[in-house]
């Protein structure tokens, strides 16, 4: 196992044919601070450059796959605050620009463009998810070609109901959930169960959590037996079909809407906060009611 990373782990398995990347901030529920995202991009590119690697697994250590963006841990604050602990990425890629331009360029580079790059990685990628997959965690998962989930996994994007945002930066929701289910989940903040995700075709396999890592590896080994050219062209055929149906252009358009949403809140708050707050009628995201599954015969499921 590689010791080159602080926020992730990287190892090669199956005689080098499989690379496994694990988000490794379990104490922060694998919240995505800037250091984690930069390391994750480097790990994906490392696997892509390795001609022995055929399949890349992406998972998370701890009780859940990921809780999404890091919204303000001490570590995350230190990363963007000028000083000795500031992450270098907060001095480039638009970080020194003013107004909406700075946030737009930073989010484009580290949230949006990164995710699109991983979606088109020249390897087959498998997301190994468990526990909860919230908000920006959906982006990491959806960038993968296939998804293997543990029993009981839940999927939710609560940025609408808790931050007043129209969705995360890589807005693949209508393509993954379906149009009306996306509207329901975004407008209520409810979660999709793993069984529903399987029925939608979003999730390929569901296993007991205790067996998840083992079964995902077995699945990856099976996929790795496919000739690399055939695997790559099969992936490319599907991705190009989606892009020709409008996926790529829709992502770009929705990223722009996301930035408009940020600019709205920044203007409302005199350029202090680019998201909705309690004073805007939203719950405090730290103390908001628990996320519950969307149930067909209940307005809100029991907690």
Identify the function of each model-found stretch.
Residues 35-39, 110, 117, 215, ...:
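Charged catalytic carboxylate motif
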Residues 21, 58, 70, 140-142, ...:
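Hydrophobic/aromatic residues within transmembrane alpha-helices
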Residues 148-149, 203-212:
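Short acidic-hydrophobic, aromatic-tinged amphipathic segments that line or gate anion-handling sites
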Residues 68, 108, 112, 135, ...:
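Glycine-rich phosphate-binding loop at the start of an alpha helix
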Residues 113-122, 128, 134-186, 215, ...:
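CoA-thioester-processing core
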Residues 1-63, 75, 301:
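Conserved CoA-thioester-binding segment of acyl-CoA-metabolizing enzymes
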Residues 1-16, 65, 73, 77, ...:
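C-terminal alpha-helix plus adjacent terminal tail
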Residues 60-113, 161:
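Glycine- (often His-adjacent) and acidic-residue-rich active-site loop
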């Amino acid at each position: 196992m590689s010791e080159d990373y602080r926020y992730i782990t990287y190892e090669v398995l199956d005689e080098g044919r499989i690379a496994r990347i694990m988000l490794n901030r379990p104490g922060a529920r694998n919240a995505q601070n800037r250091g984690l995202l930069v390391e994750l991009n480097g790990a994906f590119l490392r696997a892509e450059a390795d001609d022995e690697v055929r399949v890349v697994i992406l998972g998370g250590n701890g009780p859940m796959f990921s809780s999404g963006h890091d919204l303000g841990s001490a570590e995350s604050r230190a990363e963007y605050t000028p000083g000795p602990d500031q992450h270098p990425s907060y001095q480039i890629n638009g970080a020194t620009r003013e107004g909406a331009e700075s946030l737009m360029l930073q989010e484009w580079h580290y949230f949006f463009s990164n995710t699109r790059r991983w979606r088109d990685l020249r390897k087959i990628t498998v997301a190994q998810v468990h526990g909860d997959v919230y908000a920006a965690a959906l982006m990491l998962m959806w960038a993968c070609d296939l998804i293997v989930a543990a029993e009981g996994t839940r999927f939710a994007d609560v940025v609408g109901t808790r931050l007043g945002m129209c969705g995360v930066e890589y807005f693949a929701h209508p393509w993954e959930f379906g149009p009306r289910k996306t509207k329901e989940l975004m407008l209520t903040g409810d979660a999709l169960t793993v069984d529903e995700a399987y029925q939608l075709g979003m999730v390929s396999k569901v296993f007991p959590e205790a067996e998840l890592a083992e079964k995902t590896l077995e699945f990856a080994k099976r996929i790795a037996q496919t000739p690399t050219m055939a695997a790559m062209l099969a992936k490319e055929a599907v991705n190009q079909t989606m892009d020709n149906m409008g996926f790529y252009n829709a992502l770009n358009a929705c990223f722009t809407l996301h930035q408009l949403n940020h600019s709205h809140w920044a203007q409302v708050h005199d350029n202090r906060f680019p998201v909705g707050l309690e004073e805007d009628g939203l719950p405090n995201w730290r103390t908001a009611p628990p996320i519950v599954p969307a149930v067909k015969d209940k307005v809100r499921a029991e907690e």
